[in-house]
Amino acid sequence: MLIEIPNVFSKQEVNQLREQLDARTWIDGNQTSGMMASTRKRNQQLDKDDPVALQIGELIMARLLAHPLFVSAALPLQFYPPLFNRYQGGDTFGYHIDNAIRSTSDGMVRTDLSATLFLSELNAYEGGELVIQDTYGQQSIKLAAGSLVLYPSTSLHQVTPVTSGERTSAFMWLQSMVRDEGQRRLLFQLDQSIQTLTAQQAAEQELFNLTGVYHNLLRRWSEL
């Protein structure tokens, strides 16, 4: 399941974030790569311990945890804190699958879901599409600044070469309360239907019943 979430941050907010990020020292992006991915990757990143990156990462996580669509789709349990990368001058990241387990200061995170938050305007660069192969085929993603795409970490994906301009983004992984992607999809579809019926003021008893089904399935499938 691939979910696009527009306007997580406003254009003004993105500009403020970029002013802070652009002023930092950028390093070789292979510090987060596995052995195979490192041969396919050419970009720059901020150090994971950069204080500004950490501060903005906390802001991103807080914003996402307050976003109903993100929470409904991801059912987040634990984040691997956001990192920041930059592509320019032909930089690219060939096809790869993200590492299954990531280590944090608080322990280990199973990477169920990956997310990219775009921080460059669409007209600021050429190329740089995030191409994701999933059960529905190949999808090419290039979103407006401030928008985010969420997709299963099991997906084969790449960033195509940036032929001009500069593509800056935040990227992150998270462990979901529900490990199985198919179960998460069913819960998401059910939750979205409940929200739609609530807005349409559907019969109260039917909403109670559907909500009960949702929570009982979540109770059955979740791992905490």
From Swiss-Prot:
Gene3D superfamilies: q2cbj1_9rhob like domain, Rabenosyn, Rab binding domain. This is PKHD-type hydroxylase SO_3913. It is an enzyme of class 1 (oxidoreductase). It comes from Shewanella oneidensis (strain ATCC 700550 / JCM 31522 / CIP 106686 / LMG 19005 / NCIMB 14063 / MR-1). NCBIfam families: PRK05467.1-3, PRK05467.1-4. 2-oxoglutarate binds at residue 167. Residues 78-176 form the Fe2OG dioxygenase domain. Binds 1 Fe(2+) ion per subunit. Its EC number is 1.14.11.-. Coiled coil: none annotated. Its cofactor is Fe(2+); L-ascorbate. Fe cation binds at residues 96, 98, 157. The lineage of its organism: Bacteria, Pseudomonadati, Pseudomonadota, Gammaproteobacteria, Alteromonadales. It comes from the Bacteria. One of its GO terms (biological process) is DNA damage response. The keyword Oxidoreductase applies. Keywords: Dioxygenase, Iron, Metal-binding, Oxidoreductase, Vitamin C. GO terms for molecular function: 2-oxoglutarate-dependent dioxygenase activity; iron ion binding; L-ascorbic acid binding. InterPro entries: Oxoglu/Fe-dep_dioxygenase_dom, PKHD_C, PKHD_hydroxylase, Pro_4_hyd_alph, Pro_4_hyd_alph_FE2OG_OXY.
